[in-house]
């Protein structure tokens, strides 16, 4: 779960780094806790600075602290077997460096490098992207490619670390179209190809024999996976009430026979001149991987068949509710000469509640402090 959250955060940041035109400095704090008493605290520093008229520099620094309680049979988190009766804690650090260069008034190219490291996991990525505006800037095309090399580690009983390798190649094509002065349509296609060690070294699968006795063995996934996603989003500004609303749909499928549907909507509203309210809801549903079983027999091991203990590969539905408040500090800057540096600054507080049909739930709290230049 922790790696999933970190991956999502990274992809969101990487996408923002690609083509942002605004100079800013921001500090973000995330807190995640789930129904198994696992928790992740993240602190991030983001900088976007214009070096020349058409050149932007980006820097992202992030530190995660992970806490997993002692194994008691109730937690679904993965962790080393070593000292399993004691809490497990570890840290993860990441850095993203990026440069965006304007070629002309309508074309930008960008390159980013990502490095992440923790005790038993290391990841490096190179990301390249290009965007171009057309038809009087009413249409925007974007292409992005990424290569990632991961070193997956397993902490053994004696404290040594066994490592496995995997790599990922991904690409994205997106188009944004202004339909009217108040409506924008976005369409995109994503392709992701994984190769190498795609299991979790800590997850164990129960194997039952004819007498209903069981033993645990390591899960075994295929060493390749090809994933596709098609998504569309429409955003509309409600001028009479100074608000906006958006809705998007995403269809996903892969060669493990997993398919999913995601529907999401967001409402944004100026409550006061300096206060913005955002409400978000997301529904997700997916089918199971072809090799997922609720109960595995010993024939699976004897035949060398694939097996998994990953709950994310079974059928389930999930719901996510979000609420955020953003307070713009421009009013304070206007009233105080000594605080004019806050003219483009804001404070944002976010809360997300997640739950699914697998009896799992989580709370995420996020605080952002942003300084614009």
Predicted stretch roles:
Residues 20, 52-54, 104-106, 135-137, ...:
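Outer-membrane beta-barrel channels and translocator barrels
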Residues 20-60, 364:
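Short glycine/proline- and aromatic-enriched beta-strand/turn motifs that initiate or cap beta-hairpins
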Residues 23-27, 57-59, 109-111, 139-143, ...:
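Transmembrane beta-strands of outer-membrane beta-barrel proteins
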Residues 30-33, 81-85, 112-116, 129, ...:
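Extracellular loop and loop/strand-boundary signature of outer-membrane beta-barrel proteins
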Residues 34, 38, 58-98, 140-198, ...:
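Outer-membrane beta-barrel translocator/channel fold
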Residues 45-49, 97-101, 128-132, 173-177, ...:
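Residues on the lipid-exposed face of transmembrane beta-strands in outer-membrane beta-barrel proteins
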Residues 78-87, 200-233, 253-257, 261-264, ...:
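Outer membrane beta-barrel transmembrane domains
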């Amino acid at each position: 779960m922790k790696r999933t959250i970190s991956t999502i955060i990274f992809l969101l940041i990487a996408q923002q780094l690609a083509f942002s035109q605004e100079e800013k400095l921001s500090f973000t704090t995330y807190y995640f806790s789930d129904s198994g008493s696992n928790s992740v605290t993240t602190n991030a520093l983001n900088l976007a600075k214009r070096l020349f008229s058409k050149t932007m520099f980006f820097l992202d620094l992030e530190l995660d602290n992970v806490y997993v309680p002692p194994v008691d049979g109730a937690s679904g988190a993965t962790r080393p077997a070593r000292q399993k009766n004691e809490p497990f804690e570890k840290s993860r650090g990441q850095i993203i460096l990026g440069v965006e260069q304007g070629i002309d008034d309508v074309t930008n190219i960008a390159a980013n490098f990502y490095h992440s490291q923790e005790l038993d996991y290391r990841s490096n990525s190179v990301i390249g992207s290009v965007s171009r505006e057309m038809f009087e800037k009413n249409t925007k095309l974007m292409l992005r490619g990424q290569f990632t090399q991961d070193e997956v580690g397993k902490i053994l009983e004696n404290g040594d670390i066994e490592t496995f390798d995997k790599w990922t190649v991904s690409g994205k094509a997106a188009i944004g179209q202004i339909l009217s002065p108040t409506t924008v349509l976005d369409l995109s296609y994503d392709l992701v190809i994984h190769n190498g060690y795609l299991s979790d070294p800590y997850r164990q699968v129960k194997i039952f024999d004819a007498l209903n006795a069981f033993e645990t063995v390591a899960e075994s996934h295929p060493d390749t996976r090809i994933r596709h996603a098609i998504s569309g989003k429409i955003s509309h500004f409600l001028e009479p009430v100074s608000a906006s609303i958006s809705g998007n749909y995403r269809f996903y499928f892969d060669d493990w026979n997993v398919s999913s549907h995601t529907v999401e909507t967001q409402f944004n509203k100026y409550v006061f001149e300096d206060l913005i309210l955002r409400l978000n809801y997301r529904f997700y549903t997916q089918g199971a991987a072809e090799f997922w079983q609720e109960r595995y027999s010993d024939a699976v091991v004897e035949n060398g068949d694939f097996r998994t203990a990953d709950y994310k590969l079974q059928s389930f539905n999930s719901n996510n509710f979000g609420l955020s408040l953003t307070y713009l500090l421009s009013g304070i800057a206007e009233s105080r000469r000594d605080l004019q540096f806050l003219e483009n600054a804001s404070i944002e507080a976010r809360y997300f509640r997640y739950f699914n049909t697998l009896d799992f739930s989580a709370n995420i709290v996020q605080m952002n402090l942003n300084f614009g230049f």
